[in-house]
Amino acid sequence: MVPDDLAGLRKLYLGFTSSRVILTANNLGIFDNLKKASSATEIAKKLKIDPRATEILLDALTGIGLVKKGGGRYRNATVSNRYLVKDSHLYQGDIVKHASTMWQNFSALDEVVRRGRPARRGFDHESFIMGMHNLTVLRTESLSKALGLKGVKTMLDLGGGPGTNAIAMAKKGVKSTVFDLPETIKIAQKVARQEGVRGIRFIAGDFHVDSIGSGYDLILLSQIFHAFSAEENIALLRKCKTAINPGGRVVVQEFPINETRTAPPHSALFSVNMLVGTEKGRCYSPREMKRWLTETGFKNIAIKYLPETVLIIGER
């Protein structure tokens, strides 16, 4: 009999096997072709992949609960139809595709820990940005409720990626601006068109060096700080303070991590993701970020916890 602690350890160090099966199935388009029951041979022929390998992959997907098998035919489990099929409004396939990039970067972790420098082995910009859209679309309503948009006429989604938060607020009547790098702004404009939202202002630039505009009632920095050093984040907050109207707010949204930087596990592991993918990034505790807002002159600072993230809110 395997001791419980050893079974737990095995689950941890072999966790990559389930992950790789999901990533490969997503990359190959398996889930999009299993909305209706099909045989392994049919799927292999349609996707031009090896029949034997396809059958083994489908059996593994069945074993981990993402596919159902019966009478020699396979179809998506409910969870796969909901999140891994492109025509679902809850589609998460882009962020799963981005996880394939993370896989490559994490594979360089030995080297990164030895040298202390990131070693990006691959990066798909569009899947990363659209992956952010996959995640953010699930959180926009809870964010708006937590903030309360009364009196907010203008907002800036700084480093806004796909512009998901700005789009959601524009739908509520807020004059919204998205600021990000030029290649990212192109994607955000496409997302806005797909959502049928007009009137959003898009500014392309580098927020570390370029003007971000002014006259905002609210500036949102959602999932920005973890990519940079404390010094860079403080400088960014100073820039935000000059761009916010008197009485306006800055809102930082991040993954929460405790003061010892060890929990929750997702955040501690996400810091490793920043280690392998950025020069100076990691997760920061709410207390650290609150201290930065105090240092840069914001007042009435509040910390609010949402289901997956934490907000640090300060007033000018």
Q: What do these predicted ranges mean?
A:
Residues 1-63, 68-69, 149, 162-316:
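Alpha-helical subdomain
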Residues 8-16, 20-33, 38, 46, ...:
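Conserved Class I S-adenosyl-L-methionine-dependent methyltransferase catalytic core
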Residues 124, 161-162:
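Preference for long, well-ordered alpha-helical segments
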Residues 151-161:
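Conserved class I S-adenosyl-L-methionine
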